[in-house]
Amino acid sequence: MPKLQEMMTIVSQREVASNIFEMVLKGELVEEMDLPGQFLHLAVPNASMLLRRPISISSWDKVAKTCTILYRIGDETSGTYEISKLQSGAKIDVMGPLGNGFPVDEVVSTDKILIVGGGIGVPPLYELAKQLEEKNCQMTILLGFASEKVKILEKEFAELKNVSLKIATDDGSYGTKGHVGMLMEEIDFEVDALYTCGAPAMLKAVAKKYEQLERLYISMESRMACGIGACYACVEHDKEDENHALKVCEDGPVFLGKQLLL
């Protein structure tokens, strides 16, 4: 039976952008990681905070048995702030990997891939891009951030082969001034598959522009409680059945575009 919960060891933790932390974890759970886009459910090291925090997996190394997560912290009363205070060598209670990730098996070398990410929705797209790199397909990656202060993973994406990378910031402090949707308007090729994760407004814009695309994969960000589909705290509307609720933690977080009513 797969291992789904473990006291993982924190290898390192550092602030990589304004209020955004990178944590490297080590443990046996890494062996279960295969699909990019899945998430971990972390217990907060504070007995008064009962709910776990869902954080997407940015990348992993099965040889080293390590995985990397990036997350944004809240104020001093938040669970993520408590997690950010943990030091190297500490243990943290982790469930995962949970949810359904991005499918990559169907991708072939002739495919033209578009990846669109915004803010803290960018991290799960990095492992996706790493796996697509092995397919030798052409990737265009569009990333949007509020400002240069919160820009993450640019170097990591840029080092991948067959990648065209463009960045937009809302305030114009880096790259193109404006939202990432403006970069989509510059796409002049037929997209074979599109993968996206970010804020609801961005996802809605992507879904509208590419609603006819069969291979449109959308990763939803949502507040969660149980993380395993039991509590219905993270539901989205099903486009094909208005009486059916899609659970982000169990049915997602990755959905086909045609499934979601955004």
Swiss-Prot record:
Domain named FAD-binding FR-type is located at 3-104
Pathway where this protein functions: Pyrimidine metabolism; UMP biosynthesis via de novo pathway; orotate from (S)-dihydroorotate (NAD(+) route): step 1/1
- Protein name as annotated: Dihydroorotate dehydrogenase B (NAD(+)), electron transfer subunit
Q: How is the cofactor bound?
A: Binds 1 [2Fe-2S] cluster per subunit. Binds 1 FAD per subunit.
Which SUPFAM superfamilies does this UniProt record tie to the protein? Answer: Ferredoxin reductase-like, C-terminal NADP-linked domain, Riboflavin synthase domain-like
Q: Which residues form a coiled coil?
A: none
User: Which residues of this UniProt protein bind FAD?
Assistant: R53, P54, I55, S56, L70, Y71, R72, G79, T80
Binding partners and assembly: Heterotetramer of 2 PyrK and 2 PyrD type B subunits.
**Protein family per UniProt:** Belongs to the PyrK family.
* Keywords noted in UniProt: 2Fe-2S, Electron transport, FAD, Flavoprotein, Iron, Iron-sulfur, Metal-binding, Pyrimidine biosynthesis, Transport
What does the record give as the function of this protein? Responsible for channeling the electrons from the oxidation of dihydroorotate from the FMN redox center in the PyrD type B subunit to the ultimate electron acceptor NAD(+).
Q: Which residues bind [2Fe-2S] cluster?
A: C226, C231, C234, C249
Cofactor(s) the protein needs: [2Fe-2S] cluster; FAD
Tell me which domain of life the UniProt entry assigns to the organism this sequence originates from: Bacteria
GO terms (molecular function) for this protein are:
2 iron, 2 sulfur cluster binding; electron transfer activity; flavin adenine dinucleotide binding; metal ion binding; oxidoreductase activity
